[in-house]
């Protein structure tokens, strides 16, 4: 058990950045804060930080730990796990990674249906809306060409997962598509 150097009588906000693998570390930090009795009243995040922020709002630590301990590349995007591991571990030449990236982009981008499926499985819009923890995410409007700060609890019912997905988009690697419910392109 950690002895906090933080005033546990106060409430704090978390800011969670994007960057794939950082997501697992964010969940570990959340676990440590929870065990230390630190109260969180707001979360702001982008990309993986937005998804983890949703899990924090839902108070689903066990689900988050399980998700991150078993996560593979193919659970996020339509790719071959072995090939991705070779590229990430430097076991394939850099030019092959560049070639793969350009091939995916020429085909319209990598399909992120697996990420959409994951969001459908883990995100409970009602739990987030009823949470005492506020959540704000960052995305980018392609139509308006500007960053957007979104109060996730204020989005129209049924659109929460679309905004979380938009925050996680990696342009131009992921298939750029208009989020049909939103009607505008976001990345």
Where are the language model's segments positioned?
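Patatin-like phospholipase
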Residues: 1-46, 54-184
């Amino acid at each position: 058990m950690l002895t906090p150097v933080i005033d546990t009588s106060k409430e704090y906000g978390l800011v969670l950045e994007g960057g794939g693998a950082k997501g697992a570390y964010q969940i570990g930090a959340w676990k440590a804060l929870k065990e230390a009795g630190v109260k969180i009243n707001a979360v702001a995040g982008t990309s993986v930080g937005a998804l983890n922020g949703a899990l924090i709002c839902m108070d689903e630590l066990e689900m988050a730990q399980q998700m991150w301990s078993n996560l593979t590349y193919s659970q996020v995007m339509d790719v071959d796990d072995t090939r991705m591991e070779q590229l990430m571990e430097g076991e394939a030449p850099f030019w092959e990674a560049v070639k793969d990236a350009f091939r995916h982009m020429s085909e319209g981008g990598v399909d992120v249906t697996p990420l959409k499926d994951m969001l459908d499985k883990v995100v409970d819009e009602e739990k987030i809306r009823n949470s005492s923890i506020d959540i704000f995410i960052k995305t980018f409007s392609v139509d308006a060409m500007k960053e957007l700060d979104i109060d996730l609890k204020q989005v129209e019912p049924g659109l929460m997962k679309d905004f979380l997905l938009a925050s996680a988009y990696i342009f131009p690697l992921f298939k750029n598509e208009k989020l049909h419910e939103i009607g505008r392109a976001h990345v």
